[in-house]
């Protein structure tokens, strides 16, 4: 499971935990945008589309920042390859966004 692999590699590393926290914040923001998307009118979607795209880009950037750090610490970070890269297949962008929504969901459940 990708999330379990992430958490194992992050461990108690304070810098990795900070990067993970930043990722969770942007993932939660992105998930909120996605959750409301179907409730928006066409006009509202048009107005908010660039913001959604920007937030999605930020999610990808934060995943990459965490991976870069973990690799510098000698971790495999193979979970990032499992998510895929937009450059290899445009569909991977959607998968990364979906995984960000999953992270926000898990975070919400754990907040009980």
Where do the protein language model's features map onto the residues?
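Short, charge/polar-rich alpha-helical segments
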Residues: 2-27
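Heptad-repeat amphipathic alpha-helical coiled-coil interaction surface used
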Residues: 17, 23-26, 30, 37, ...
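Acidic, low-complexity, intrinsically disordered interaction modules
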Residues: 35-99
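Short acidic DE-rich linear segments
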Residues: 109-112
